[in-house]
Amino acid sequence: MSSRYGRALTIFSPDGHLLQVEYAQEAVRKGSTAVGVRGANCVVLGVEKSSVSEMQEDRTVRKISMLDRHVALAFAGLTADARILINRGQVECQSHRLNFENQVTLEYITRYLAQLKQKYTQCNGRRPFGISCLIGGIDADGSARLFHTEPSGIFHEYKATATGRWANTVREFFEKAYSDHEVTTKCDAIKLAMRALLEVTQMSQMRLEVAVLENGKPMKMLDSVVISEIVKIVQNEKELQAKAHKMKR
């Protein structure tokens, strides 16, 4: 009897669960960790990239993509599913510019993708998208926005959040480390995102992808040299804080 509920997408289990949606959320929990930080005038997205073969082109393994000049999406979960949502999101952004002659708002494109995900939880012959998305960018009024969508179709806005394998650990870190007066510059937001990823990433296996969006500027991907320099700064600050804490004792 339980297998029937597990295989059926549109049938609730006796305890009120849609098991296929929960299985999709489990696929997200097995994905690479992705973080997002909203600064005063920027948004930073960071992802822990999976290891790839030495023969594979590194540029083809991307966890962060542009939906429009002012919107970027990072994800955790199934890459093939993400490609479909990214394509749909890009087309919707272009269509909105063509029809209304202005850019989409962050809430609009987030709601569009969330509604698409929700439809796939009610249709026979389809399965839910096995990805969770962090959607960040700058609205036309210059305000930075950061949203998080789940496979079920729900979405929320955050100051800082995470998804993927170590999402709970990173969220706990953000709750302790994030404050508006400490994330006033682009550099502050980048360092906080990097600190969050370093909480769950081993230095010897570190492969990070970091994108920055600012008002009036295209999305900028940080190269490996810049990332390494910021990691050193973050590590030094962490050591100094640890020493200061010991001295207080």
From Swiss-Prot:
Subcellular location: Cytoplasm; Nucleus
CC per GO annotation: cytoplasm; nucleus; proteasome core complex, alpha-subunit complex
Pfam family, one: Proteasome_A_N
The entry's keywords: Cytoplasm, Nucleus, Proteasome
GO BP: proteasome-mediated ubiquitin-dependent protein catabolic process
InterPro entries: Ntn_hydrolases_N, Proteasome_alpha, Proteasome_alpha-type, Proteasome_asu_N, Proteasome_sua/b
Tissue distribution of the protein: Testis specific.
Subunit structure: The 26S proteasome consists of a 20S proteasome core and two 19S regulatory subunits. The 20S proteasome core is composed of 28 subunits that are arranged in four stacked rings, resulting in a barrel-shaped structure. The two end rings are each formed by seven alpha subunits, and the two central rings are each formed by seven beta subunits. The catalytic chamber with the active sites is on the inside of the barrel.
Family affiliation: Belongs to the peptidase T1A family.
Name of the protein in question: Proteasome subunit alpha type-7-1A
Species annotation: Drosophila melanogaster
Source taxonomy: Eukaryota, Metazoa, Ecdysozoa, Arthropoda, Hexapoda
Gene designation per UniProt: Prosalpha4T1
